[in-house]
Structures are given as structure tokens and as C-alpha cells.
Amino acid sequence: MEYKCCSDKYIWSAHDSYFYKGLSELILDIDELIYLSQEKIRKDFVFINLNTASLNEFIRRDSEWLSAVKGKQVVLIAARKSEALANYWYYNSNIRGVVYVGLSRDIRKELAYVINGRFLRKDIKKDKITDREMKIIRMTAQGMQPKSIARIENCSVKTVYTHRRNAEAKLYSKIYKLVQ
């Protein structure tokens, strides 16, 4: 997991050239809506693409990537299946904001809103993953079985399945599909 500096614009994941190209064009397109200079955005911001292909790495190693971007203004670009996780990281770390990529949303306005620092907790309309659900998601991503998770978390197997089911409802997908 590495992030990349392309023409001083930081993106994560480094291999996602389509994301970089699209994001670069979007930022140039909304230049008149942004209060900060292009140079400051390139220098101080990290844009993270939370898509289903990269979610496994972000879930398993969230403490690593969060410490790697310390001191930067982190903007999460969240697909529908990763909105609840993006909200969790927004609440539990130093994230500047979340841009929700939906079919009916104007991504340009949302991106400008976040870059300008106007994204607040009240802007989160979707569910967020709880701490217990996140622990269970992490352990599932590491390949642990519900019985082992229950023993570690000091709860019943039924409780593990309940938290897993609740997390899956918020993520619109089965956990094992996201962490493959």
C-alpha cells in the first residue's frame, strides 16, 4: 500500500491512474469554487479512493495508512459500499471530509465543499460503522472465524454474527466479499 505523488498531487492508491486523471480534471474544473490555490491543494492534500478493489487493504491496515498521511488534509472519495467505513474513519481520525460518489450527486460541488473545509459532522447522513463492528470486520479480513472472534472479544458467537450482519447492512454487501 503506497501513495503516490504525481505532479505534486497526492493520491492513494498509487496504481490508480484513472482515479488520478479524473480527480485532476475535477479539481481543475472546480478551480473557481475553491478558495485554496492549486499549489496548496497539491502540497497539503491526500485524496483516497475508497473503492471495493482497495477496501481490503484499508480495512486491514487502517492504523498504518492513517499514520502515513498524518499532517496532510485527507479527503476520502467513497463509493456507495464504502460510505459507512468512510464515516467511521471520519469520526475516529483526522479526516478533512468525505465525498460521496452517488449517481444523483454533483461530485464537483461536494469536492469543493470538502476542500474548502466546510464538511462537518452534521453533513453525514449515512450510517457509520461502530467500533465493535469495525473490530469484527478487521478480524474477518484477517481470516478469523466467528468462534475465535467471540473468544477474543469476550462475547457470544451470536453477538459476533449480529454485529457482522449489522455491518453488512450498512456496507450494502457481505463482509467476506469486501475483504477478499
Swiss-Prot record:
Gene3D superfamilies linked to this entry: Winged helix-like DNA-binding domain superfamily/Winged helix DNA-binding domain
GO cellular component: cytoplasm
CDD domains the UniProt entry points to: LuxR_C_like
UniProt GO MF annotations: DNA binding
Domain HTH luxR-type: residue ranges: 122-180
Entry keyword set: Activator, Cytoplasm, DNA-binding, Transcription, Transcription regulation
Pfam families xrefs: GerE
Residues in the DNA-binding region annotation: 146-165
Localisation per UniProt entry: Cytoplasm
Database matches in SUPFAM superfamilies: C-terminal effector domain of the bipartite response regulators
Keyword match Transcription regulation: yes
GO BP: regulation of DNA-templated transcription
SMART domains in the record: HTH_LUXR
Domain of life: Bacteria
Cross-referenced InterPro entries: Sig_transdc_resp-reg_C-effctor, Tscrpt_reg_LuxR_C, WH-like_DNA-bd_sf
Record bears the keyword Transcription: yes
Family: Belongs to the EcpR/MatA family.
Function of the protein: Part of the ecpRABCDE operon, which encodes the E.coli common pilus (ECP). ECP plays a dual role in early-stage biofilm development and host cell recognition. Positively regulates the expression of the ecp operon.
The protein's name: HTH-type transcriptional regulator EcpR
Origin species: Klebsiella pneumoniae (strain 342)
Lineage of producing organism: Bacteria, Pseudomonadati, Pseudomonadota, Gammaproteobacteria, Enterobacterales
